[in-house]
Every structure is written in structure tokens, then in C-alpha cells.
Amino acid sequence: MKRPRRSVAISLFAALAVASAFVVAIAGCSGSNDGASTSALEGLDASQAKDDDLKTLDVGSDLYPPFVYTDEYGDIVGLDVEILTEALARIGYKPKYQLIDWEKKKELLASGELDCVMGSFSMTGREDEYRWAGPYLASRQVVAVDPQSDIYTLADLEDKVVAVQSTTKPEDILLNHTNENVPQIKELYCFSDRSYLNPALVEGLVDAIAAHESSLLTYEKDYGVTYRILDEPLLEVGLGTAFDINDTRGIDVKLTRAYQEMLADGTMERLVSKYFDDPSPFLNMEGLS
């Protein structure tokens, strides 16, 4: 089967200029990818631990609301930030968060510049690429379309133009046809910055976008945009924290245990409930790796 043509983000820049006001508004709310910023979190269960007694881990992520975003002070915050900060404190570590180019995450881990990466990161299908801590939450990779679109099922994506964030599971699924229910699409736009996905759909530059369902629901709520999310998911995944494949320190094992404790003692449910009205879909990880 012929693979869909893959277009990098630059190919849509001219078209996206039409939606520049929309894009600028999004960028202003999301914050900048330049430099590092530390997160200021209060009220976590492990906050009693003396900060000076904790070893520091360098943690990288890109912006992926509500899991990772910057607040009005420029601090890196979000659901994944709260979860990881709590879990690391339980095993004697504290995170130093920095925003990264998501496409460079593997080389940053391999070089030792980062200890781990996170940010709604699907471990399903990548089990042999990293050392994983998790899964700590469940998620669905889904397709979203305009409410008036004639796309109702995955089969309706045939000969359509779809946008994804580069190096994500939707990109892999659509490029390599790893889901037998997904037909041959016409073209796949791969953006290095996920903030371009939503304007591309809203402005009619693509027929559909694919991403974590949770991020799409958050965008709807925050910006008053309405999607129609297809009932059939591309993939059901477990979210994890990734360490370099050659990292032998064992932090991933300890962190996995901390995540399991947080699931068992109700901490995970409490944190997820701060961001989503119904936390139950995120806590149902039966069958996920």
C-alpha cells in the first residue's frame, strides 16, 4: 500500500499566515518554548520532604495542556508536572523542568542533558525504545473533525488531509498503517509544535487532526472551539515517563512503584480531578503496558 505523503510543518506556514491572529492568541496563552523554567507547586502530598535533601533530575517536555503548560508567571505547570513532582519526592528526587524541542528528546536523553522526558507521552508501542516508568494514566489517541464534516468513522479518512504533531503515535499510525481500520489518506501534515493543529482544522486547512483526546477536550474548554471526536479511537495507550534505554540507575523502577502507590492511595485520582470532571477514564489501565 502506498504511504501517504508526509509534509513537515514548514509546508503550511504560508497557509497558516491567514490564521495568524488565531495562532498568536494561542501562542500567547501557551507560553514560549525558549529556555527553561521551574515549576512552583504547592500543597503536594510529599511537600513535607525537605527540598535540600532531594536529588535533582532534569526533566524535559514540550507544551501539551493540560499536562504541561506555562502559567501567567512563566512557570511550568500542569497535571503531569504535579504527578511527577509528587512521585519523585516519594523516591528522594526533585524535578528541574525545561521545555524542549520534542523531536530531539532521544538525543537529549542519550547525551545526559536530560534524565527523563514526560508530557502525555504514550509508552504503548515504544516499550523497546526507552526505559519507562509507568503507565501512570490511560489515554486515547483520537481523530477530531469539524462538527459539519462528513467524516464520521476512521474509514471516512480515505483521501483526506490530516494533521498531527511530529514523532507522536498518530503520526506513526497514519504513516505506517499500523491500525488496519485506518484507510489510505491523501496527505499527512506533521507539525513540530502541536499548537498549529487546532488552527489548521478551524481554518479548514486540513480535514482532520489526531491527538490525545484529553488535550483536544482541554482545547475545546479553554478556547470555546467545538470538535466532533470520532467514536473509534486510533489507539488506547498508557502514559509514562521515559528514560534513556541505556540508563541503568534504576530510577525508572522506583518511579513506577511510586506511581502504583499513588494510584492505590487515591493521590492520582485527586490530581486528575483537578483537571478533568471525570477522572475514571484516565485511571482504567487494564490491559495497558
For each predicted feature, which ranges?
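Extended ligand-binding regions for polar small-molecule ligands
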Residues: 81-90, 151, 155-169, 241-280
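Short helices/loops that flank or line small-molecule/ion binding pockets
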Residues: 89-90, 98-99, 103-116, 131, ...
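Acidic, polar ligand-binding/catalytic clefts
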Residues: 81, 85, 94-156, 233
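A ligand-binding cleft/hinge motif common to bilobed small-molecule-binding domains
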Residues: 107, 120-129, 173-176, 200-236
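Periplasmic-binding protein-like
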Residues: 61-63, 138-145, 221-260, 278-289
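Bilobed "Venus flytrap"/periplasmic-binding protein-like clamshell domains
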Residues: 58, 62-66, 74-89, 121, ...
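Ligand-binding clefts/hinges and TM-proximal coupling segments of bilobed small-molecule sensing domains
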Residues: 31-43, 94, 169-189, 228-229, ...
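Extracytoplasmic small-molecule ligand-binding "clamshell" domains
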Residues: 31, 36-120, 190, 254, ...
